[in-house]
């Protein structure tokens, strides 16, 4: 049975309080939906609506920069 915090084994990255960055082993394929990802190497997902692209320095919903008139989550 794989460890629940091991993203490589489970393909699921638990980014909240349940897992520390040490045991998670998140890789490039791991996606997090929050700005508080505690797993090292975990990529935070930032999505802009429509055909808008995220700006530089976007690490999560709180720092997401989209083009004017575009919403971000």
From Swiss-Prot:
Record's superkingdom? Eukaryota
Specify which residues bind Cd(2+) 2 according to the UniProt entry for this protein: 19, 24, 39, 42
- InterPro entries attached to this UniProt entry: Metalthion_mollusc (IPR001008)
UniProt: Cd(2+) 4 binding residues: 46, 58, 64, 72
Write out the residues that bind Cd(2+) 3: 26, 30, 32, 42
GO MF, one term, reads: metal ion binding
- The UniProt record gives the binding positions of Cd(2+) 6 as 54, 66, 70, 72
* Repeat as UniProt keyword: no
Induction pattern: By cadmium.
**Ligand binding (Cd(2+) 5):** 48, 52, 54, 58
Q: Which UniProt keywords apply?
A: Cadmium, Metal-binding, Metal-thiolate cluster
Which residues hold Cd(2+) 1? 15, 19, 32, 37
Q: Which family does it belong to?
A: Belongs to the metallothionein superfamily. Type 2 family.
**Record's subunit section:** Monomer.
Q: What does this protein do?
A: The metallothioneins are involved in the cellular sequestration of toxic metal ions.
What's the protein here called? Metallothionein 10-Ib
**Native species:** Mytilus edulis (Blue mussel)
Lineage, broadest ranks: Eukaryota, Metazoa, Spiralia, Lophotrochozoa, Mollusca
């Amino acid at each position: 049975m794989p460890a629940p915090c091991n993203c490589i084994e489970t393909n699921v990255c638990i980014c909240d309080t349940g897992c520390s960055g040490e045991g998670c082993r998140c890789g490039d394929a791991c996606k997090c939906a929050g700005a508080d990802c505690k797993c090292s190497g975990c990529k935070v997902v930032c999505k802009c609506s429509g055909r808008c692209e995220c700006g530089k320095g976007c690490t999560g919903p709180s720092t997401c920069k989209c083009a004017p008139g575009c919403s971000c989550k």
